[in-house]
């Protein structure tokens, strides 16, 4: 049994937030944070609450045409944290999951900007290395809030699963994964980090299979 992804058939439809259409689109992938009330996510939050869960955080990601996000996990360690995901746009954009051949090759890095492209636009990655901190200090610039991610090089990983994320999904973000959008159309993804109401701990993928058992599409 694979523990990376499941498609869902939910008891409601949720259209792409109109707020996304007001965003100036870039030629690279970008993480953007919006308030739930501005995204009108109440139907999703009510559903999450009805099955004994709660939203820890809401994230929005824009996947630019012919661009992708390098191999990473959404956590500073390799785990099985799960997100509930909704996507709109390119039907060809894929998420690929990887397992490290040698865990010692997995690095934890501080990012102060979330442009983690893995293509020719990789220069947009902003890692908070010591030389970079010194460069910013000398320029009189403050380093923004830091986010820790685990990441690895493709040559140090084994590809284990690829899925087109074109419908509601459960998505293991604690394992290494990357994205690639080969089309000429962008893609928006709205994700929710989930927690269990009974103990306030983050939901793990294998646990999510029980909470969402009535809504998982069998493959």
Residue ranges of model-derived segments:
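Short beta-strand His + acidic residue motifs that chelate non-heme Fe in jelly-roll/DSBH
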Residues: 70-74, 171-183, 191
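Long, compositionally biased interface segments
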Residues: 191-219
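A short hydrophobic beta-strand segment most commonly corresponding to one strand
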Residues: 82-86, 168-170, 185-202
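Short loop/turn segments at secondary-structure transitions that flank enzyme active sites
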Residues: 89-92, 177, 196-198
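Non-heme Fe(II)/2-oxoglutarate
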Residues: 1-62, 68-69
């Amino acid at each position: 049994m694979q523990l990376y992804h499941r498609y869902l058939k939910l008891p409601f439809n949720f259209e792409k937030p109109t707020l996304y259409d007001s965003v100036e689109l870039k030629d690279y992938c970008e993480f953007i944070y919006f308030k739930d009330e501005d995204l009108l996510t109440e139907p999703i939050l009510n559903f999450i609450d009805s099955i004994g869960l709660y939203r820890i955080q809401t994230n929005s990601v824009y996947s630019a045409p012919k661009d992708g996000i390098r191999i990473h996990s959404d956590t500073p360690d390799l785990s099985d944290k799960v997100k509930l995901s909704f996507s709109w746009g390119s039907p060809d954009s894929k998420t690929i999951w990887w397992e490290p051949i040698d865990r010692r090759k997995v690095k934890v890095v501080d990012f102060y900007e979330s442009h983690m492209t893995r293509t020719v636009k990789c220069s947009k990655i902003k890692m908070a290395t010591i030389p970079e901190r010194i460069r910013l200090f000398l320029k009189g610039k403050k380093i923004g809030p830091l986010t820790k991610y685990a990441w690895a090089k493709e040559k140090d990983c084994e590809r284990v699963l690829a899925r087109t994320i074109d419908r509601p999904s459960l998505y293991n973000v604690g394992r290494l994964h990357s994205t690639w959008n080969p089309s000429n159309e962008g893609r928006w993804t709205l994700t929710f980090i989930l927690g269990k109401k009974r103990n306030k701990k983050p939901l793990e993928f294998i646990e999510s299979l029980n909470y969402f058992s009535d809504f998982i599409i069998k493959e």
